[in-house]
C-alpha cells in the first residue's frame, strides 16, 4: 500500500494514491500487437506461402509453357494516410511479383519480369485499414480448429454412451466416424452415406481380415464388445481392396461407372494429396497431440496418412471402452483464432486460384514466340477478391471511434460468426456460455447484450495468440525443486537436507550460500528440494496445456522473497477448484486483472458488481462521448494510462530532450544529439461516429522532456489517462419523483460550466457532374434564392469557414440544367437578349439537413482544373465539415461505470438542488432504489472513496480484485472528517479542488490525545476509523474512550440512529432542500461519482413533421427520422381513441393526416386559406385492399354512391362465375378466357399504382427527394 499522501507522477502531474496490494510482475502488453503482428506475418510469410502454392503454373497438357513466381515486393504507398482520409481513397501499397516464363517446347527461359498484382490495403501503425477514406478494422474470428474430435452421445434406444468422431481438415473432405449400438464403427465421407470402417481400411491398403484384426488386437480387447469384428461382419460381401475401392467410388460418384484405378486415384486425391487435402499446420499439430503420434515436424505432412486413420479408430474404441475421455468442443484448446493476416491470406488465395485457372487457359492458346508473363496473368480476380473482403466481409467492420476505448475494444474483438463460423440462429447455449478455459484468455464480462451474446467476445488484458492461432495467457513459474547445478539455488531455502553419502552439505531450512552451492553442484546430477517459491519467470500457455497444471491465484499471500505464507493454497486444476499444499503448486497467475478485458478492468470495485451490470458498464464506457473538458476519474483502476497509450490518441515522447517549439498543430523536441523529433497534432478530426478528435499540447516551450512523457492529450484523455466522463457530486435520494424509473436530476451548474458539453462533427459532400443536358455548375447565382440566403457564401457559391448555419441553409450553391422544352416567342426573345442566363436550371444546392445546425470548421474543394483525381463525369467535389457544440439536455442518457444508467428528467436550478452543510449544492441526484435490486454496490464504494479523495485532495487507483477494502474506505472517510474538524481542509472557491494540510491535521489529532502520524499512515489500518468515531461520540456527549472495535461501531450506530446525524465513516451528510432550506428527514449518501454522457443523445432522436414524403403504394407518410417520416398511429393507439370515444380525432388520424390523398390536399388548402376543413374521403390503403381482393378473383364492391373504386359490371367480368356462358366454355378456349381476365386485372392494378402526380406533389420536400435520387 502507498503510505500517507501520494506524490504526483512526474510525467503527468496527477496525484494518484494506489490501493493495490500486489506488485506488477508483468507489464500490460501492447494491446493492439495481435493486429500488427498478424499483418506483418501476412506480408512476410503468408503471401510467400500462397505464391509457392500456385507456382509454377503449367498449361493443361504440361508441355507448352511454365510460369514461375520467384519473389515479390511491396513498393511505397502512393498516398499518405492523411491524404487517403481527405480524398476518400484507400491506403494501399502496390504489390509486384517477379515472374519467369519458360517455353517448354524450345527450352527458352525468358528474362524475369515484375508483374503488378494490384494494390493491397496497408495496415496503419494503429492496426486499422483506410478504405475509401474511412477507417475499418478486421475483427479476429474464433472458430473450431482443424483436427480430430471425439464426442460422446447417448444412444436413444439403449441409453448407452457411444463415440462420435469428426476429422476436420483446413481444406478438404470431412470424415465422420460413428459407433452404433451393435458395436459397428462406420464412417461418412464428406456427408455421404455411411460405410463400415473396415471397408475404408481395406481401400487404403489393409485388405485382409487378419491384417485388420491384428492392427487393433491390443486395443479391441473388451470380452463383451468386439468393434472391429462387428464392423467386418456388417458388410460380408466386401473382402478385398478392389471391392472396397469400387464400393466407396460408387457412393462418392454415383453416376460414374466404377473402376479400380479411378477409385484408387479418387481416394488418394481426396485424402493423401496435399493439393486437395490439407490439415494445415494447426490441424497436423492438433491431430499429432490428440492421437499421441510421434512428433513429426508439423510442416512435414499436412495431408492424411494411413497411420492417422488407424490411430483415430483405436481412439474411438478406447473412448467407447472408457479408456479415454471425450473432447469438449467448446474448450479453447479446440477453438482457434483466425487473425487479420490469415483472413486476408484466405481471401487472397481465392483470387490466386482464379488467376491460375485463367493463366492455364491462356497458355493453351497464346503464340509461343511473342508470349509474355503479363499476357498470361489477369490480376482482376485478385484485386476484386481483396476489395470484396475489405469492403463487404462480415469481419471487416466500420471502426467504432466513439472514444479511444471503443477503438481498442474493436481491435481486440473476437467473433464466432462470419464465413465458416456460426450464425446467431444456429448457435446454442453451450457455445455462447462462459467456459473455464476462457480464464485469462477471453473476458467473461464483455459481450453484447442482444442476439450476439456470447458469440462476440473480447481478448483478456494479458492474453496473446500463438503461431497456431490458440490464445495463451501468462503464468509465473513455481519451483519446489531444482537441479543441483542450477545457479538459481543460491539464496534459496532448502526443504530437505542435502548430503553427500554420510556428510550433510546443507540442512533443511537453511539458505544455500555460494560455498554450499559449489559443494552441491559437484554431486552427481539430482533434484534438490527447495521451499516452494514463485519466480519472476513467466510462461505463456494455451488452454489445453494449462489443464495439466495446478495454478494458484494472483492474490495468494507471498513474502518478499516469493515464498508462500499459507500452508494450504486455493488453486485451479482444469475446471476444478482445489486446496493444495505449496509443494503441489506448479504456476501462479500474474495479475488479478488478467481474467478481464481492457473495458472490464477499467471498472473500479468490479468485484462488488453483479456480472450482468458489469457487462453493461463495460459496454457503456465504449459509448461515452468525449467531452469538451476531459477529466480523468477521481476513482480509477490504473488501466486508464494503458488504454490511452495503446489507443494512439495520446502522443508520448520517443526520446528525451527539450521542447524547442510548441504550437496548436505541431510539437518539436530537440534531443541531446541536436536532432529534432517532430510530432503533428490532429485538430478537430471527425470520427466515424461523428465525435471529435482534437489533440492539444500539455507541455510548454523550453520544458525538459523525458522519454515516454506525455506531450499531447486528446479529446478523451487527461495527462495521458483515459478521461471519458466527469467527476460529479452525487446524492442518493428521492427528489419530487423526478428520479422515478432510473431518471436523473442534474444541476444547472453542469450545463452552465459545460461539464457535459461535447463536440460533434458532420461531413456534407456535393459533386458537380456532367449530365446529358450539360454540366452542373457550383455557383452563387441560384434561381429564386434571396440575398439573405446567400450572405455566407463566397463568390464561388461555397460557404465560408466560421459561418453559423441552421436547417435548410445553403452550404454549396449548385444549379443543374433542366430538360429543354419548346420555347415560346417571348422565351426565345429573352434567350436572345440574355444568352445562357435565361436557360432553365433547377436549384440542386447542398443544404443543411432538417434539424441540424452548427459552425463550419473546414471546407475542401477538389476539381479537375487543379489536377485532382476525380471519378468519371465528376468535375468538382466539395466537402464541408460542420461542428456542433452540444450541451447536455433533458432526455440525454448518462451512465456510471457499474451498469447504472438513466435519462435526464430535469435540469434543476442550482439554488433548488439539495445542498451540504457547508452550502455546496450537489450536482446529480440518483435514485437509491436503483442499487439493491441491481446488485452493483461498486457505485456506492466508488462514491465513498471518491468523496474522501475529493476532500483530501488526491485521486485514487483501486485495481480490480486488488483494490481498497471496506476498512481502507472507512479510514479514508475518517481522515477527511478529521482534517475538516481540524480546519486543515482548504475548500476555498479559487481552488479547483479541495486540499488538505496534513501537518495541521496531525497536530490537531495530537492535541486530542492520539498519535496523528499513525492515523495518517496506511500501515495502521482501522486506526483512523477508531479515532474519528471516538472524537465524534465525544462531540455527541458520549464517553467512548474505553470502547474499541465492534463495540465502538455499535455505539456509534446507536447514537447516529437516535440523533439522525451521520457518523464520520458512513459517507453520509445532512442535506437541506434548496427550495425550502429545511433539512431532509434522514442523512443522505453523498460522494463523488464518475459519470459518462453516452452517444444516445436526444437531439439525434427528436423529430417532428408537418408535411413530408409519402409511400408510393399505400400513400401513407414514411416512417423514421431519416425519411422525415410521421409518427405511426398503430393498432393500440386506435384502440385508445376508441376507448375515449374521440371519433372525429380518430377519423382525421386515419384519413387526412394519413392516406386520404384528395382529402389531405384540400385540408392543406383549407388551412392556408383559413377555412374549415371539409369532410374526409376514403383512405388509399382501403382502395388498395379492395384492389388486392379483386385481383384474387373476389367480387368486392363498395356500396356507396360517392365512392367509385371499380364498376360492378367490370368486377363481375373478372370473375369466372359471371362470365357469359361460362358453363359452355370448352377446355380449348379456357386459357384464352383466363388470359383476357388476367389482363383486365393487371389494368385495374395499374390504375391503383398510377396515381396522379399532383397528389404526390403534396410533399413539401418531394422535389428534394427526387433530386437526391438523381444524385445517387
Curated annotation (Swiss-Prot):
Residues 1250-1272 are annotated as: Disordered. Gene3D superfamilies: 2.40.50.100, 3.90.1100.10, DNA-directed RNA polymerase, beta subunit, external 1 domain, DNA-directed RNA polymerase, subunit 2, domain 6, RNA polymerase alpha subunit dimerisation domain, RNA polymerase Rpb2, domain 2. Keywords: DNA-directed RNA polymerase, Nucleotidyltransferase, Transcription, Transferase. One of its GO terms (cellular component) is DNA-directed RNA polymerase complex. GO terms for molecular function: DNA binding; DNA-directed RNA polymerase activity; ribonucleoside binding. InterPro entries: DNA-dir_RNA_pol_bsu_ext_1_sf, DNA-dir_RNA_pol_bsu_external_1, DNA-dir_RNA_pol_su2, DNA-dir_RNAP_su2_dom, DNA-dir_RNAP_su2_hyb_sf, RNA_pol_bsu_bac, RNA_pol_bsu_CS, RNA_pol_bsu_protrusion. Its EC number is 2.7.7.6. It comes from the Bacteria. It holds the Pfam family RNA_pol_Rpb2_6. PROSITE patterns: RNA_POL_BETA. It catalyses: RNA(n) + a ribonucleoside 5'-triphosphate = RNA(n+1) + diphosphate. GO terms for biological process: DNA-templated transcription. HAMAP family: RNApol_bact_RpoB (MF_01321). DNA-dependent RNA polymerase catalyzes the transcription of DNA into RNA using the four ribonucleoside triphosphates as substrates. Belongs to the RNA polymerase beta chain family. The RNAP catalytic core consists of 2 alpha, 1 beta, 1 beta' and 1 omega subunit. When a sigma factor is associated with the core the holoenzyme is formed, which can initiate transcription. This is DNA-directed RNA polymerase subunit beta. The lineage of its organism: Bacteria, Bacillati, Chloroflexota, Dehalococcoidia, Dehalococcoidales.
